[in-house]
Amino acid sequence: MQKSIYKNIYLKILAIFFTMLNIANIYIFDNIRLFPNLDIMIIFFFTICKIRVFPIWFIFILGIWSDALNGINIGISSLLYIILIKLFIFFNYPEKNINDFGKNIILFVLFLSILLILKTGFLSIYTGKIYYLYHILIEFFISIGIYAILSSILLKYNREE
């Protein structure tokens, strides 16, 4: 029991650390700035693939903090995280833990695409600015590549226990 409490604390610290890493944007060219989306990867993996590792209140706090660090209107990320997580858990509930690498990647692609479309749409409506599609697509594909590596490591780590 004590080992699982420490593991849960370590995972929350990892999620907080990845949320802080989203401050360090990746600049490809002068006008293309990308977010690594590491916090989204950890939130997805430990709420949808491994159900209920992170409670909803923790995801809400991570979303608020992520918005504040990135200068986005506070609350949009939290709202979208919680709605999408509840929706994905509802449709994926019969298969509580996903240990299949392929299905894990497919679900992440679907989750990330819906999240980026909704977040970009809400921000475009709220700020009145139009966000460039190629920025979103590059961020999307880079995030999928990073998640494939991160997911394989996390799946291997969870199978060993």
Name these PLM-found stretches:
Residues M1-E161:
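Terminal, non-globular segments
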